[in-house]
Amino acid sequence: MSASEHDPYDDFDRQRRVAEAPKTAGLPGTEGQYRSDFARDRARVLHSAALRRLADKTQVVGPREGDTPRTRLTHSLEVAQIGRGMAIGLGCDLDLVELAGLAHDIGHPPYGHNGERALDEVAASHGGFEGNAQNFRILTSLEPKVVDAQGLSAGLNLTRASLDAVTKYPWMRADGLGSQRRKFGFYDDDRESAVWVRQGAPPERACLEAQVMDWADDVAYSVHDVEDGVVSERIDLRVLAAEEDAAALARLGEREFSRVSADELMAAARRLSRLPVVAAVGKYDATLSASVALKRLTSELVGRFASAAIATTRAAAGPGPLVRFRADLQVPDLVRAEVAVLKILALQFIMSDPRHLETQARQRERIHRVAHRLYSGAPQTLDPVYAAAFNTAADDAARLRVVVDQIASYTEGRLERIDADQLGVSRNALD
């Protein structure tokens, strides 16, 4: 079926790489297909073990810190919800965008971006590690659901449009000019699957659904990281109104975000500080009124940033369903600057804290120790599915990739138990 105004997605978008036989366990007379292909894809991600493991993986602070921690799982749920709301305004398929939000961090290793850095060091000589490329690898091969005619895993066997919606960086690490890119969406090992997904797509252009997911991710972690920082008393939003403090944040932001100037960041800090919902938070003291004010702030900021993108995109692209490559997401520069200010607050007052940096250093050391142990003792040290892959790997690079895949799949609890067993000490001594 070709795309139409009623259904802007076509059979090419819905195609799965491996044909699947009909289900056989249903009762007689109940064989009808009541769900769309994208709804089925969303369910596959939601029921996956890889998604559940995100409950014990760090977002900013560890999943066992505080009474109401944000984990990679809760963050993914928030991204999915924000993305779904944006999809309503743009005419994208709701299940498709929600799926992209759920799966956007599904390949992240223990300790979040810090663990990503450590695994990239472990695999530096053999293709490195990137969380977005690992997302694709999990969805197309590592998460068990479907096998092909040769008995090889096809992962969740999602539709082409679903896999593309999760692909924020639709390119390999090598740029074709002899350089290696820091952010990329596919490992060389997964080139065949990547070519299938990107067939007919404009080179290195993410589809609209992936762009929506990407902005929803930015909105979610910038707003919610600040919320968590306020609750933990690490962030005081009154710094936005203090000229000297705001100027220091702007200088830091100019170094971190090369596309935003210090003047733009200063102006953004002033705009945010003058919002009534920001001023209402004041000095947070955990009372009922303070908690209500903070929750209203997060809700209104999410709405501010998401609705600005919807309205600006609509103004540029016009009416009707906006899907796939019919439009690009448009975000006003002043809104991007405001989101950048919130990111800088978290960077300055949470991620740059010396205690946080010391913890991160120990975490990277732990990943290196476990990687060395697994590789030197493989295949006996590997789970059965990874041991089999290790035994059939063609070379050292492929064998190391198997070890990295296993570590990336670990929850933080399991990684720490393995490390403690290796060192012969209690797990608490490693924290």
From Swiss-Prot:
Coiled coil: none annotated. Disulfide bonds: none annotated. The keyword Hydrolase applies. It holds the Pfam family HD. Residues 1-36 are annotated as: Disordered. One of its GO terms (molecular function) is dGTPase activity. The keyword Cytoplasm does not apply. Keywords: Hydrolase. One of its GO terms (biological process) is dGTP catabolic process. Residues 1-20 have a biased composition (Basic and acidic residues). Residues 72-222 form the HD domain. PROSITE patterns: HD. PANTHER family: DEOXYGUANOSINETRIPHOSPHATE TRIPHOSPHOHYDROLASE, DEOXYNUCLEOSIDE TRIPHOSPHATE TRIPHOSPHOHYDROLASE. Belongs to the dGTPase family. Type 2 subfamily. HAMAP family: dGTPase_type2. This is Deoxyguanosinetriphosphate triphosphohydrolase-like protein.
